[in-house]
Amino acid sequence: MRSYRSIFSPATAQERAQNFEDYWLYTRQNDGEIIEDQKDLTRKRELRARFEAKAVRSRKPLADPECFYRNCVKMQDGPQTLDRKTLLLTFLYKFARHEWVGISAAWEATAPMAESMRTTQRISRYHLSEEFCHIRLFQEMFRTFHLDRVEWVPLAPWMQRIYSIFPLFPGELMSPPAFVSELLGLTVYLHLDKALDDILAQEPEAREHVRQLLREIMADELAHVGQRRNFLGPVGLRVAKLIVGPMYRTFFRDLPEAKFLFDIDQMVRDGKGFDYSLIAPELLKRSWVPSYCRA
């Protein structure tokens, strides 16, 4: 059995350069061709069509769907008053909304494929297209629970501004928080995957449909973590390790549902101690891991 190392394992500049080429090969094989004007990818589109052809709908719709719509953008009711299924879905919306805002800003700031001369530029365009595909999978999760009126809306103006200027930072400044952001996303998905068994215990069909959608996202996100790690030199890696805790806690403070669903302290520990050996083998087989994180 293959063994793995920590995501914070050191790497030489030469190793990182080769890993960018390896990742570029992997992502093209995994995604197919980019459909740039639609922020889509051919193989992801085919996958989505298969999910939609075998769509599952909850046998027990939310008791009060309007409670979801009322609280998904901003929590209007006390989170402790929401049932756990609704709480999970309002959290998922808020989390995905941050993703949508961030990738929308980054898309405008990155060069289109026709102007992308470097491998890292082409990787970034594919990466963002994958993230837009994830947003479409989130939509299918909501439809699983008969929530057909979900729309993505902007964040508060000051937060929108932060997301809009972040992609303009020099790489040395942007790379550590960009890496930690990907690590945070993967941490959320891993904890969410575990929570499904409890929260959706009475709905096995819906639970497994959501889990399949989630694991498609997780396979990509696992690769994104390695890819973003590859942008970090020794100094950037040290900075990233220092900001895991502050970034995680700051992010979750903006999502009031989080502390009612997850152990935030454990999520921080998982981020700081992330090791590929803790990931399920079937997920690792479908994803990409930097060579310097493989023993």
Language-model segments: what does each one mean?
Residues 1-295:
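Non-heme di-metal
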